[in-house]
Amino acid sequence: HYVIIESVFTQKRLAKERRSKIQLYYDIITAIVEDTQNNDSVSPTRIQFKCNTSYDKLTKYLEEMKERQILEKEKVIKITEKGMKFHSDYAKINELILDVSRDIKAT
């Protein structure tokens, strides 16, 4: 019985953990990449739903990413070459971290 209660608290704690800014940048670019298979742009509202974040937070991060030249934003949002490089590099780093985590758990 105690283990079940502990598990519920653990799940709630994990659910409340916030994404880092860099993770949210990656999630935003991933949402754009997934949504632009046939187009080269996507609306902010679509990104908001795919990233499961508030519109205010998304708008703030989109502006930061535009200032850092990761995205181009006019009426629609486009990923720059720098943004695609960031997405690719982050995916590689994330995969490396997951591999190391699996190795540690296996030992």
Regions found by a protein language model. Name each.
Residues 52-66:
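Short amphipathic alpha-helical interaction segments
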Residues 38-50:
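Short acidic, hydrophobic short linear motifs in intrinsically disordered regions
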Residues 2-29:
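Short alpha-helical segments that sit at the start of domains
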